């Protein structure tokens, strides 16, 4: 028989949307959001966060074991970060959202895409010799179609 559930004070619970936390972006999700682990171990997907950055995250919701968050403060920025070239870029309601990585330089985008493809192929047991390099578009913004 299990004992009574231990209560966690609301002020320390990350389910409370007002509780922000600081974390290191350790990976990128398939949709382009940064993967940040909260101090309690819950994984958050954070739009606008890039590999290696340290960010203060404001939780915005979640589903099961995965939380969603927004960057409240960027404490350490990636060296590849830049001003997005498209005026429609952003993560707020009413902004396009079709090119989530425009805030980093194009070579960094290509490198991240290459790493994602290689990781997926490895999971599928596809030989690394069969994987071709990612091909850059002739013009950085000329291939997007959202």
Place the predicted regions along the sequence by residue.
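SAM-dependent transferase fold signal centered on methyltransferase-like domains
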Residues: 1-146
């Amino acid at each position: 028989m299990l004992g009574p559930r231990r209560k966690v004070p609301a002020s320390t619970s990350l389910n409370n949307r007002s509780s922000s936390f600081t974390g290191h972006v350790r990976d990128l999700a398939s949709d382009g959001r940064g993967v940040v682990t909260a101090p309690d171990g819950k994984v958050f997907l954070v739009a606008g966060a890039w590999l290696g950055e340290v960010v203060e995250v404001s939780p915005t919701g979640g589903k099961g074991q995965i939380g969603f968050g927004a960057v409240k403060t960027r404490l350490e920025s990636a060296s590849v970060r830049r001003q997005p070239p498209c005026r429609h870029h952003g993560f707020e309601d009413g902004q396009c959202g079709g090119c989530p990585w425009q805030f980093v330089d194009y070579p960094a985008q290509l490198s991240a895409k290459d790493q994602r493809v290689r990781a997926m192929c490895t999971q599928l047991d596809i030989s690394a010799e069969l994987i071709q390099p990612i091909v850059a578009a002739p013009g950085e913004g000329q291939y997007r179609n959202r």
